């Protein structure tokens, strides 16, 4: 969630209808109160009581040991594969912590970057861009790879070039890896979306009626069954694909909390990480400390409901981008916008580019690589996450439209997709939300998504079909999460968030018994780390002193 190299977004705090108010308007709760010793769930005593062997590890490069004092320490701990059978198979969870830089350590702050399927180990390596100096001084910041991911016991699939743990970085910058660097390498702040473009061409095929809907579903089913068989053949232990649900991850997180020495979990979760945090607070309200959920997921939504919300969100964000491009805001110095006319015309020009590239892919600087419409659509959608990087998207579109050259689109696509893991993403989501509907209802949803989002509706649809084909399904029906008895939970929502629409943050804050909504009137996905001092100060104040923002606090950008 880097603030970015292209723009610094300055926020001004406004109370709802009450003029300017300070970010910390409610009396501070002071240091985290001494807590009674957290209870250990029956049968899990050996896991909660295990000894953690922390070792010095490299500042970058995952869990690699270091002979130097880098300020980072790593460890792996053991948890049950199946919490209903704790005496059975076990798996490992990898942790990496950045030691508090201040003299008065307040404990540990656990963080999750989203996904599902993204690495908290990688996230904490970027602590200086992910977390403020205030938070770095106060806390040991611990990132962990959830079960099924990265350096933990991971879902492993053969990508055709040898076995790879799902979520393992393939080089370049992962979509949840806002590491400072060149403008290209820093192009995408994060992409922890509940739904992303599927890897199979059939996900987009048929959007213009090229094939029948039942044929589209047949193709999706075939592809996802093949992918599941591939992953099942390479993943060990064999039962892992049935135990990567978020409830299990939340139970792992409580083990990690206990092993850190804290009686309360302090937590910062982004996007999917908000769902994990809410599940944790519901399971362990007495163990919940200071929790911030940024870019919230509404737990009442079905797979289809989430997809529909995102389809509308991305289409709205696309129009906002076009307006800023045409007004000269989303361009680099000395560059023009290739999108002519009004916003409607500009959106149509992007759609026309996608359609044209599907028919005749664009050449690139590499004679062996071309760029099709699906790649362009994916780049456009991914770069809508971070408005500070819209000038890079403009440059890529300008090259593609005016020169028929997809070179820069391909560069951005490679950066945006490095380290992504479609199998883990579906393995988790399909276990979290049961399949609903049938081919008839899916086609209705598909047509509705095409209507509300002509640009992205097709690629975001048919999530239930994919999960049905994947075959590892959950039974936990979508329902409100209340987390009764938990400490205050700060829910941060961005009004122009395409991936987790603002309405989702409103819904989660309303559902949580102790939820409080903090609003950023900005564009892009999530707010903390990429908005401005209003949001940052409010979040930091809560995490470090327990100060809850004024109810209804809204932070405006650009003032």
Task: Describe every region a protein language model picked out.
Residues 250-264:
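Conserved acidic catalytic loop of the alpha/beta-hydrolase fold
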Residues 156-197, 279-349, 395-404, 415-416:
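A catalytic-pocket lid/entrance helix-loop region that shapes and gates access to the active site
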Residues 2-7, 15-205, 214-218, 344-350, ...:
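Catalytic-loop region of hydrolases
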Residues 119, 251, 269-281:
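Glycine-rich nucleophile elbow surrounding the catalytic serine of serine-hydrolase chemistry
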């Amino acid at each position: 969630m880097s603030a970015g190299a292209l723009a610094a977004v300055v926020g001004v705090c406004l109370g709802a209808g009450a003029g300017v108010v300070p970010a910390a308007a409610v009396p501070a709760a002071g240091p985290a109160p001494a807590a009674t010793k957290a209870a250990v769930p029956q049968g899990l005593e050996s896991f909660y009581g295990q000894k953690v062997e922390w070792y010095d590890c490299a500042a970058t490069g995952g869990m690699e040991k270091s002979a130097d004092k880098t300020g980072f320490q790593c460890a792996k701990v053991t948890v049950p594969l199946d919490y209903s059978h704790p005496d059975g198979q076990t798996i490992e969870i990898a942790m990496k912590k950045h030691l508090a830089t201040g003299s008065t350590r307040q404990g540990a702050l656990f963080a999750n970057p989203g996904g599902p399927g993204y690495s908290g180990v990688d996230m904490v390596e970027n602590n200086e861009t992910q977390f403020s100096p205030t938070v770095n001084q106060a806390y040991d910041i611990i990132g962990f790879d959830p079960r099924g991911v990265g350096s933990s016991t991971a879902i492993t699939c053969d990508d055709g070039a040898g076995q790879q743990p799902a979520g393992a970085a393939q080089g370049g910058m992962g979509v949840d890896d806002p590491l400072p660097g060149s403008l290209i390498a820093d192009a995408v702040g994060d992409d922890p979306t509940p739904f992303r473009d599927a890897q199979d061409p059939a996900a987009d095929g048929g959007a213009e009626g090229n094939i029948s809907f039942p044929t589209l579903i047949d193709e999706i089913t075939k592809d996802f069954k093949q992918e599941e068989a591939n992953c099942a053949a390479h993943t060990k232990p064999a039962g892992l694909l049935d135990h990567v649900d978020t409830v299990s991850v939340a139970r792992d997180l409580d083990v990690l909390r206990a092993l850190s020495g804290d009686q309360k979990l302090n937590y910062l979760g982004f996007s999917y990480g908000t769902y994990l945090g809410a599940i944790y607070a519901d399971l362990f309200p007495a163990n919940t400390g200071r929790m911030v959920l940024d870019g919230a997921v509404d737990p009442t939504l079905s797979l289809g409901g989430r997809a529909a919300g995102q389809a509308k969100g991305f289409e709205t964000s696309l129009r906002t981008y076009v307006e800023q491009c045409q007004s000269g805001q989303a361009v680099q110095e000395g560059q023009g916008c290739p999108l002519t006319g009004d916003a409607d015309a500009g959106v149509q020009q992007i759609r026309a580019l996608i359609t044209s590239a599907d028919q005749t892919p664009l050449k690139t600087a590499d004679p062996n690589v071309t760029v099709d419409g699906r790649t362009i659509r994916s780049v456009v959608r991914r770069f809508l996450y971070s408005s500070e990087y819209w000038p890079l998207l403009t440059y890529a579109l300008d090259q593609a439209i005016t020169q028929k050259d997809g070179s820069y689109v391909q560069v951005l696509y490679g950066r945006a997709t490095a380290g992504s893991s479609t199998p883990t993403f579906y393995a988790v989501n399909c276990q979290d939300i049961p399949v609903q509907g049938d081919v008839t209802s899916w086609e209705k949803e598909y047509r509705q998504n095409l209507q509300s989002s002509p640009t992205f509706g097709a690629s975001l649809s048919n999530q239930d079909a994919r999960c049905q084909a994947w075959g590892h399904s959950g039974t936990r029906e979508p329902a409100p999460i209340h987390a009764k008895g938990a400490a205050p939970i700060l829910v941060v929502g961005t009004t122009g968030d395409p991936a987790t629409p603002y309405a989702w943050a409103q819904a989660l804050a309303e559902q949580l018994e102790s939820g409080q909504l903090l609003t950023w009137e900005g564009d892009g996905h999530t707010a903390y780390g990429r908005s401005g001092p209003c949001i940052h100060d409010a979040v930091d104040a809560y995490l470090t002193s327990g100060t809850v923002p004024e109810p209804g606090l809204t932070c405006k950008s650009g003032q």
